[in-house]
């Protein structure tokens, strides 16, 4: 067999991972020696073979529908991938495919041990040949289901299609930000599905085979593939390792096909300590140990701890993985460079996970620690792990404070008939203690409407103040044409926005009105002012021609205008 460093046409390393067509049966001398593999490694390889077989099944269904619906031979050749098969056949005349070579090697290994009845190989090979003949272009499917957490900080985006590959199941984008800024990868751990307690305590999780069979897979063109047929079952049973996939271990590819993940009952606790170092402007999270964790696999877990400093969803830190341990001792310090003033309103999220080498990591529990109420002089603390609650920065009641002054100038109050109509003045001074969406600072501006007029003509805004969490705007906006009666029906909406290269994102805002719920006799959702906001607006009405000052929270729960 050629060495890894010297790939050749006949070697495994020269073979594509997803075959397009099938060559002749590998010769016996070209097979691989797999006698050194452990049972767990055999199951892992068998999982890849099963995924490959299911992808072939899906691709055959897609190609057959294309042949029935596309009349143009040239377009059909491109859509079905026949062009690639022809090009490959000219370049590699006798090359075998990796899946065929590994499958044949596993059959030979099994037969050598005497675990299969005579003639089994011939039947399996016939099933493989019957099933795998014909062109099969590369299939592209979603690696993992769309993330249901909202790391929900913006509009939902469809999960982009990525080539199926053995990627790191841990790294994930959690961001659904502004339009056009959605992540281009979906990874397994960050797309953790909503967990439900498993009945039976430490009962071993079982693959959801019914869902895998019933949820017929969706191809790139949006069509559904036909269900499995007996020839596929024969192909999957061509080695004992493939048949062993009925056990509790699922590969990442199978997880993606079924669209569901396994859940374990959350239990146990985590021991940790928090310390802030003013000199280094650094928050230090000392993860000491966990006790009584749930067993994820075969009465064991491979746990590690992951932390986020919410609402920054890019602030992930992780400990090392402790193998086969339900009471792991980590003794690791996770560090965050953050000014002490920014800790107000931040929430530390500590979650415990089982590291799955081939599939989706399994959630074991989490705790959330609001830092504004934390006793920094306390000793290391034990907290019980809780079921998963999707972290959403939008759940924060406020993202900072807005300092402003208001003044109402009635018509003719300045003499000589000036101003000709009532004027409403807004002096936007500054924002304080803003909470960023991600690590780093913000590029912010304030936008103002006086409702019910939400047209672009009514919109005014400040300049953009870049790279600051306490931006100073010092900007005045003036609206005219308002009488005292109009102010009782109006609502001034001031919102703070993060300016992005592709799109802007609202961080929070305030609404100044009497909060009656109606405007000019109509019920409206934007008359939802808080007591603080009502008090400031009432002071404006009672003190014409005088500035009234306010320091208001930038609410994240502003009701939609319509």
Swiss-Prot record:
Q: Where is the RabBD domain?
A: 31-87
Q: Where is the composition biased (Basic and acidic residues)?
A: 118-153
Q: List the subcellular locations.
A: Cell membrane
Q: In which tissues is it expressed?
A: Highly expressed in bone marrow and lymphoid tissues. Detected at lower levels in cerebellum, occipital lobe, prostate, stomach, kidney, appendix, lung and trachea. Expressed in cytotoxic T-lymphocytes (CTL).
Chief site of localization:
membrane
Lineage, top-rank taxon, reads Eukaryota
What keywords were assigned to this record? Cell membrane, Exocytosis, Membrane, Phosphoprotein, Repeat
Q: Which residues carry this modification: Phosphoserine?
A: 216
Biased composition range(s): Low complexity: 233-255
The record, for PROSITE patterns, names: C2, RABBD
Its Gene Ontology biological processes?
exocytosis; intracellular protein transport
Where are stretches of biased composition, namely Polar residues? 206-219
Q: SMART domains per the record?
A: C2
Q: Which residues form the C2 domain?
A: 266-385, 398-527
Q: Where is this region: Disordered?
A: 1-29, 94-255
Gene Ontology CC? exocytic vesicle; extracellular exosome; melanosome; microvillus membrane; plasma membrane
- GO molecular function ontology, one term from the record: small GTPase binding
Q: Does the keyword RNA-binding apply?
A: no
The answer to keyword Repeat applying to this record is: yes
Q: How does it sit in the membrane?
A: Peripheral membrane protein
The UniProt function text for this chain reads: May play a role in vesicle trafficking. Binds phosphatidylinositol 3,4,5-trisphosphate. Acts as a RAB27A effector protein and may play a role in cytotoxic granule exocytosis in lymphocytes.
Note the subunit structure.
Answer: Monomer. Binds NRXN1. Binds RAB27A that has been activated by GTP-binding via its N-terminus. Binds NCF2.
- What name appears for this protein in its UniProt entry? Synaptotagmin-like protein 1
- Source organism of the structure: Homo sapiens (Human)
């Amino acid at each position: 067999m050629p060495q890894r460093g010297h790939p050749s046409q006949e070697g495994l390393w020269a073979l594509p991972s997803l075959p397009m067509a099938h060559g002749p049966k590998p010769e016996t001398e070209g097979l691989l020696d797999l006698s050194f593999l452990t049972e767990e490694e055999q199951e892992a390889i068998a999982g890849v073979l099963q995924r490959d077989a299911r992808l072939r099944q899906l691709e055959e269904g897609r190609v057959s529908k294309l042949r029935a619906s596309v009349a143009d031979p040239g377009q059909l050749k491109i859509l079905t991938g026949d062009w690639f098969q022809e090009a490959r056949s000219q370049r590699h005349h006798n090359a075998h495919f990796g899946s065929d070579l590994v499958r044949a090697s596993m059959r030979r290994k099994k037969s050598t041990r005497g675990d299969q009845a005579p003639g089994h190989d011939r039947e399996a090979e016939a099933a493989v040949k019957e099933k795998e003949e014909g062109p099969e272009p590369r299939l592209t499917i979603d690696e993992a289901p769309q993330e249901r957490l909202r790391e929900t900080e913006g509009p939902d985006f469809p999960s982009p299609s990525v080539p199926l590959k053995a990627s790191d199941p841990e790294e994930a984008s959690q961001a659904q930000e502004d339009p056009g800024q959605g992540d281009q990868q979906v990874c397994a751990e960050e797309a953790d599905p909503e967990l439900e307690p498993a009945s039976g305590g430490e009962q071993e999780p079982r693959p959801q085979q019914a869902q895998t069979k019933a949820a017929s897979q969706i191809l790139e063109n949006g069509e559904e593939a036909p269900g499995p047929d007996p020839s596929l079952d024969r192909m999957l049973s061509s080695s004992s390792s493939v048949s062993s996939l009925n056990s509790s271990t699922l590969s990442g590819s199978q997880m993606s096909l079924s669209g569901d993940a396994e859940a374990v009952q959350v239990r146990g606790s985590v021991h940790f300590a928090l310390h802030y170092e003013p000199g280094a402007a650094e928050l230090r999270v000392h993860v000491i140990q966990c006790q009584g964790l749930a067993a994820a696999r075969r009465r064991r877990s491979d746990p590690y701890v992951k932390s986020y400093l919410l609402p920054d969803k890019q602030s992930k830190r992780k400990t090392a993985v402790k193998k086969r341990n339900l009471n792991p001792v980590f003794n690791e310090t996770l560090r965050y460079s953050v000014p002490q003033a920014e800790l107000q309103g931040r929430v530390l999220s500590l979650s415990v996970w089982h590291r799955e080498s081939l599939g989706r990591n399994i959630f074991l529990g989490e705790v959330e620690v609001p830092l504004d109420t934390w006793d920094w002089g306390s000793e290391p603390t034990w907290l019980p792990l809780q079921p998963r609650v999707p972290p959403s920065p939008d759940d924060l009641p406020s993202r900072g404070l807005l300092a402003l002054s208001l003044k109402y100038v009635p018509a003719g109050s300045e003499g000589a008939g000036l101003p000709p109509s009532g004027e409403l003045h807004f002096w936007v001074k500054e924002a304080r203690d803003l909470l960023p969406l991600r690590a780093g600072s913000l590029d912010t501006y304030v936008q103002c409407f006086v409702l019910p007029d939400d047209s672009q003509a009514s919109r005014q805004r400040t300049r953009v103040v870049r790279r600051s969490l306490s931006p100073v705007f010092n900007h005045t906006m003036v609206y005219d044409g308002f009488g005292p009666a109009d102010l009782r029906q109006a609502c001034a909406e001031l919102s703070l926005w993060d300016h992005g290269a592709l799109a802007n994102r609202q961080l929070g805002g305030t609404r100044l009105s009497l909060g009656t719920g109606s405007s000019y006799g109509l019920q409206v959702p934007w008359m939802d002012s808080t007591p603080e906001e009502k008090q400031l607006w009432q002071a404006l009405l009672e003190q014409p021609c005088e500035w009234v000052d306010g320091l208001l929270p930038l609410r994240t729960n502003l009701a939609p205008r319509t």
